[in-house]
Amino acid sequence: MPKDSSLQSILLIGSGRSSSAKAAEFDYSGTQACIAFKEEGYRVILVNNNPATIMTDDVHADAVYFEPLTVEAVEAIIAKETPDGLLATFGGQTGLNLAFQLHEAGVLKKYGVRLLGTPIEAIKRPRGGPRTFRALMHELGEPVPESEIVTSVEEAVAFAEQIGFPIIIRPAYTLGGTGGGIAENMEQFLALVEKGLNESPIHQCLIERSVAGFKEIEYEVMRDQSNTCITVCNMENVDPVGIHTGDSIVVAPSQTLTDEEYQMLRSSAVKIISALGIIGGCNIQFALDPNSKQYYLIEVNPRVSRSSALASKATGYPIAALPAKLAVGYTLAELVNPVTKTTYASFEPALDYVVVKFPRLPFDKFPHADRKLGTQMKATGEVMAIDRNMERAFQKAVQSLEGKNNGLLLPELSVKTNDELKQLLVDKDDRRFFAILELLRRGVAVEAIHKWTKIDRFFLCSFERLVALEKQAAAATLDTIEEQTFRFLKEKGCSDAFLAETWGVTELDVRNKRKELGIVPSYKMVDTCAAEFHSETDYYYSTYFGEDERKQPSGKEKVLIIGAGPIRIGQGIEFDYSSVHSVFALQKEGYETVMINNNPETVSTDFAVADRLYFEPLTLESVLDVIEAEQIKHVIVQFGGQTAINLVKGLEEAGVPLLGVTYDMIDQLEDRDRFYQLLEELDIPHVPGLVANNAEELAAKAAEIGYPVLLRPSYVIGGCGMFIVHSEAQLAALIEQGELTYPILIDAYLDGKEAEADIVTDGTDIVLPVIIEHVEKAGVHSGDSYAWLPAQTLTGEEKAKIIDYAGRIAKKLGFKGIMNIQYVIADGNVYVLEVNPRASRTVPIVSKTTGVPLAQIATKLLLGKSLVDIVDEKARGLAVMPYAVLKYPVFSTHKLPGVDPMVGPEMKSTGEGISIAATKEEAAYKAFYPYLQKKANANEVYVIGNIDAELEAEMTAKQLTIVADVPFSDWVKRDTALAVIDLGKEEGEANKRMTALSRQLLVFTERETLKLFLQALDVDHLDVQPIHGWLEKKKQAEQAVIA
């Protein structure tokens, strides 16, 4: 059928701010949906308050609203834009929840807006109405675990007594299993039910008989309005049911199912999507008894999901773009597969390789957090690897995680006893994969490990072969290794770095020997059809099996962009934004773009973005292999975060030409002695600081500087390993804990304002469009700070110094491209804290709110252009912004028991949000609005320690009740509880802060953040405005200044 001509405009709901369980996958799918709608001539209206996304670029939508994802805000947008249709399935659970709320509030009916794709009943049944959903499944003959929906602890207990333990608790309308878990006894059950009811936006939980230990199988299914259904991909979780699929190792296609089991579950998936009437994509999860053919349906996600992005990248099938086309009337048989350009979308993908996904968990940041995995997702991101055999796919996935180990050995586990390792498996610890390998090294039988983990023996035997590879490598040396053995080790995924470590030589030695023997990878194509048809895509993975399948290059000059790898705390979706914009700029300049990355969630790994895409680990070996295979002469590292920067030294030593930066330049900025020397040469003030190489030096030099001091390592991102130390005793305790790495930098801690700026430079001139001022004082990581664009309280003199110092640094270094500089303003001086010779996490928000495309300008400068050629001189100064932009952090620490929500120098946030308004107060209101709306009847704040009279008076004036004399354990359960205030940051009160967070209360440990919140309480309305409206006001203001 042709597209629906009754639609002229479509409102797309984004997924909002990134968090654990909600990362870049929704940016990828949402971007594809916007492009698909624009291709069909529809006017696209987008609401999404995540500034780091590609989808919120004005080229992808006709009107972009950075507004809260609430009924009130979206209704205002609908009234203003009058869309004909609304699509929520690309906004994750956030989008579905909001669509349901708009329907229930009568907003869609009032304005005549049609819900596209997933019908409202399909949204309600799997999540909001388990009774009706279960009835439908029984009608279809589809087995579901015995379950009951409850709205109170009492109802839950009554059902638990009927079915017995273990029991799974699933809160309704949440994402990533938030608030849920498996209870083995009544004590655990009561805690999880109470938490789950609190997390659910409709105060409901599904209480379900546990099928933990069964195989977990997923199907990505697609359906059109003619009821044509296909399965795009089926995936098997290595971990059995009981660990959230987002935290599990996943392989595609499934490896342990018989054909009968595969077809049985496929038929079930098709039957379910048809019965629900879903138009578009759907993720369906099953639990399969490993000892019989009994299965249960455990979850239906009637939307694009994290698994959808994985399935899309695993198969090459455009799983996001096609559902958008289906939603407006097309059928699968009418849509051509853009990969082959000859087959149709109704043709099911086929794989002639294996894909392995590993989760990226945050415990390197939070080693003291509860590392046990369950039904609530904790991962911040993931990596994907492709190869022709299971062992190499596993090894490539581990290499992509960027851990400190070159192979599969975790040193921290090698000192544990067998019983301790077994306990890690029983507890479902995040290190269980490495614990299994350690037990196998010690000769523990596969059968015993299977008994403890319920992981299929097929996978355990594959792990056993990985251990055998280690022994085989250790039995040789670089001089004695036979070609056949060497080739076998490479075929099975042993990295050059691992072999170098094993043989006591350098990685370059191994590489040279390997090339001398002609052992080099070939590159195979991801084509959706297992080479059955000709493919038009340049989407590749490396393997040591078979012939090279790469197409002939275009003849254009090539540039390689190194991506940022998996999303993690400190390095998120913002870096993908910069990478993609660099690709766009290069293509406009006539270059052939080559992207290397390993993150299946991102836009940068969409095969339609760069001219050639390589899905590979971001290791020196893999990057050099691609450079040599493609004969690349230009490499960009500035947009790949610390991942790419850490490769600079090795690439330079290998003779690779890097654009805009050298290792010496980076070292000059990271080595504190050299950095301070640079600043002194330029007459730029810096914070007093010293370097310590051991514990004795650290204690002496900290005393020399005087407390408080800030400790930080070099070459890190996200403030990893940073501490503020207030006393000699606190330092002694840190040294005793053994958590410090040397050499370590010791800076005097200045209690002042913090600011930062992103600049682009050609080595002579700079463009610095806006100064960002942090709300909190220095000492809170920039990624965890609320921040104003433009700066709100800096004087003209302070701004002039910030710009002047940036210009001096850029010119002295001869730096080209983009950099981020951080400052502290204290005692009447402007100090330079640090310079990052790369794109920062603030590039997207600066680019979008000023209209200055920093990443694209920087790319052109890297190619040799000057600012004079690109940016008009009048546009090089600070932007005139007649509006207030507030960047605010998003934390997922409530999903990580044991993590204190107190902010400090080490970054903890997993994402960011944006609010734009005419005044600071309204911008603050928009930032806190979803919380204030949820806690509309709450007015009590619990104070730990003391607060000053000024704050007390202000809170009283805002009609907040201050509580300090009620037992905390009683108060925190009240419906009137709003926030906990602990400005003294009492060390002994961490449990109260964590408990408050688990109850979804605000926790304030910084006076400035609390003041911002109080400002927000003065506002009671929302004014919605698209970004182009704000930029038009900016243009008018700048013209008025010129006039």
From Swiss-Prot:
Which residues does the annotated region (Allosteric domain) include? 933-1043
Determine if Ligase is one of this entry's keywords: yes
Residues engaged in binding ATP 2: 712, 748, 750, 754, 779-782, 822, 834
Enzyme Commission designation? 6.3.4.16, 6.3.5.5
Q: Where does Mn(2+) 4 bind?
A: 834, 836
Annotated ATP-grasp domain ranges read 134-328, 676-863
* Annotated region (Oligomerization domain), positions in chain: 403-549, 403-550
- Which reaction is the catalytic activity of this chain? hydrogencarbonate + L-glutamine + 2 ATP + H2O = carbamoyl phosphate + L-glutamate + 2 ADP + phosphate + 2 H(+)
Pathway per the UniProt entry: Amino-acid biosynthesis; L-arginine biosynthesis; carbamoyl phosphate from bicarbonate: step 1/1
| Disulfide bridge partners, by residue number | none
Q: Where does ATP 1 bind?
A: 170, 176-177, 209, 211, 216, 242-244, 285, 299
Q: Which residues bind Mn(2+) 3?
A: 822, 834
UniProt key word Metal-binding: yes
Give binding positions for Mn(2+) 2: 299, 301
Key words, A-Z: Amino-acid biosynthesis, Arginine biosynthesis, ATP-binding, Ligase, Magnesium, Manganese, Metal-binding, Nucleotide-binding, Pyrimidine biosynthesis, Repeat
Which residues of the sequence carry a binding annotation for Mg(2+) 2?
Answer: 299, 301
For the region Carbamoyl phosphate synthetic domain, give the residue spans.
550-932, 551-932
Region entry Carboxyphosphate synthetic domain: which residue ranges? 1-402
Present the record's domain note: The large subunit is composed of 2 ATP-grasp domains that are involved in binding the 2 ATP molecules needed for carbamoyl phosphate synthesis. The N-terminal ATP-grasp domain (referred to as the carboxyphosphate synthetic component) catalyzes the ATP-dependent phosphorylation of hydrogencarbonate to carboxyphosphate and the subsequent nucleophilic attack by ammonia to form a carbamate intermediate.
Q: How does it assemble?
A: Composed of two chains; the small (or glutamine) chain promotes the hydrolysis of glutamine to ammonia, which is used by the large (or ammonia) chain to synthesize carbamoyl phosphate. Tetramer of heterodimers (alpha,beta)4.
Q: Which NCBIfam families match?
A: CPSaseII_lrg (TIGR01369), PRK05294.1 (NF003671), PRK12815.1 (NF009455)
Q: Which family does this protein fall into?
A: Belongs to the CarB family.
The entry's protein name is Carbamoyl phosphate synthase arginine-specific large chain
Protein's organism:
Geobacillus stearothermophilus
